Amino acid sequence: MGSVSKTVISARGASPDDEQNGTKNGISNGSEWAKCIFLFFFLFIAGMSNWAVLAYTHDYVPRESLPDIVFSLVSEQRWASSLGDFCVALCIVMLGALLVIHQHRGTILKRVVFCAGTLYAMRSVTLAATQLPSGYTDNQGRCRDQVESEAGVFFGRLFEQTIRIGFQSKDQMLCGDLLFSGHTLVMVTCSLAVAYYLPKSIKPLQWVSHVACLIGMICMTISRTHYTIDVVIAYWLSNMVFRMYHAYCEVDMCMERRKSILYSWWPCRIVDWLEQDIVPGRLENRCQLPWRRSTPRGQERGGASAESSDSSVTMCDNITTSHHQKHVSISSSSTYPLPC
């Protein structure tokens, strides 16, 4: 067993002693802090870019709404806008509760933040590329007046959006924040995370977030906060980003990850860096309140080291741990798992 583990590490370009001595606590902590700082600024800049585009394009967006299949079937329901916001808040609360009770809350938070940042970065590009008019029946009354572009007006709007975290007054708002739906990407990402990471004993609670997400998407359309296409694209992209990230994480060996077609997609290079200290494979979904110390049972699958002071850092190079053992044979062409 020991010789196989050493062979695997040597194949990754490290000495056999790296399994025990290669990662010191200081280096690991520094790496984790670097990842946290990167993710914070990534999400912050992605969000700010959305608000900056809205602050600028509001004065150029037409006021005549476009045809939409749902708009032709259902009249504008203004009450649904508030219900949609409530559904967004409920999905966020569900995710927050999951982070409180889950043993690997730090790993989950990093993954969700990266997915959200990626989606908001995509959204800022679509907002800047194509400006759609709002779908309200009375766009002139619901949207703020259009003025000549000035730096003072732009930065004032940007500051307002920043302190409100993107939320706006329902009566006088900046218009053109449409393609694609930010409400939907938040709800879908949160509900996917809740469903994926909930421990089995409380798995049925995932339906709370799923139902809230479905109702919220319907409300976004019938309230004419978004066109149907905004919601559909947001749903597709949110699923794609979340599932591609986790499909990459579930590739059960680091060397196989590098051979995967996913690795050729440049965001997966960042994912590879974010996941380098986490044992490949699916997280073990287990409850553990943050104020309770974990028992010294060894390292758990999926990076328990980030959440427990009683275990050492689990690196991607370390193929064998007490709860996640891999028996592998390395040839010049590929790797093959052997039965344990």
From Swiss-Prot:
EC number: 2.7.8.27
Annotated spans, Disordered: 1-25, 294-313
Keywords in alphabetical order: Lipid metabolism, Membrane, Sphingolipid metabolism, Transferase, Transmembrane, Transmembrane helix
Enzyme class, spelled out: transferase
Subcellular location: Membrane
A Pfam family it matches: PAP2_C
Transmembrane segments: 36-56, 81-101, 178-198, 202-222
Cytoplasmic side: 223-340
InterPro entries in the record: Sphingomyelin_synth-like, Sphingomyelin_synth-like_dom
Record-level Gene Ontology MF annotations: ceramide cholinephosphotransferase activity; sphingomyelin synthase activity
Membrane topology: Multi-pass membrane protein
GO biological-process terms attached to the record: ceramide biosynthetic process; sphingomyelin biosynthetic process
Pathway involvement of the protein, from the record: Lipid metabolism; sphingolipid metabolism
Function field: Bidirectional lipid cholinephosphotransferase capable of converting phosphatidylcholine (PC) and ceramide to sphingomyelin (SM) and diacylglycerol (DAG) and vice versa. Direction is dependent on the relative concentrations of DAG and ceramide as phosphocholine acceptors. Directly and specifically recognizes the choline head group on the substrate. Also requires two fatty chains on the choline-P donor molecule in order to be recognized efficiently as a substrate. Does not function strictly as a SM synthase.
Family designation: Belongs to the sphingomyelin synthase family.
Protein's name according to its UniProt entry: Putative phosphatidylcholine:ceramide cholinephosphotransferase 3
Lineage of source species: Eukaryota, Metazoa, Ecdysozoa, Nematoda, Chromadorea
Gene: sms-3
